[in-house]
Amino acid sequence: MLPFPNKKYGIIYADPPWQYKENWGNGQVGYETMKVKDICKLPVSDISMDQSHLYLWVTNPFLAEGLEVCKSWGFNYKTLITWIKTYKNGQPEMGMGYYFRGCTEHVIFGVKGKMKCKNKITRNMFYAINSRKHSQKPNCVREMITKSSGDIPRIELFAREEIQGWDCWGNDTKKFNKPYIQDSFQWNTC
C-alpha cells in the first residue's frame, strides 16, 4: 500500500475501488479493486481532523458496505448526495443493475466531530451528463464539496486525476489528467 500523507485534513473525498462479486460487460474495470475489509482498514481516521467531513462514493449495491466504511473511518453518517446520470438529451442513463437498471451513484456524507456545513442551500442531488470515462466523477462534485465544507485542507483518496487545491492519494493519480473543463450539470432540476 502507498504510504498515507503525514498531514491532517478537514475534507476526505474518496471513491474506493469496490470489488464486485461479478464482472459486467467486458468484465474488466481497468484498475485494481479492494475488498471492503481492506478499505475499512485504511488509516483514514489518522489523517482526518477532529472536526471533518467525509464524502464517500458508493454504487447502489455497495450502500451498506459504504456505511460500514464510513463508520470504520471514524465518521458518523448524516445523509446521501445522489448523482442522477443523464444522457446529453437530459434523459436518465440506462445503466447496469442486479435487479433494476441503475442511473444513480451516491456520495455518503459523514461527519467527524460536530463540523457543520458552510452552505445550507446545497441540495442533496444533482443531474450531470455521464459522458466521462468509467469511474470518472463530475468535477462539479468537488466544487459542491468546497462550497459546503469550506476552503480547508482536503484530500481525494483513490484519486485518478490531480486537481489544484486538492492533495491526492492513490496508485493512479494521473489517469484522467487534462485541462480542467467545466461539466455540463444542473442542480436539482426536477
Q: How should each PLM-predicted stretch be described?
A:
Residues M1-C190:
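Class I S-adenosyl-L-methionine-dependent methyltransferase catalytic core
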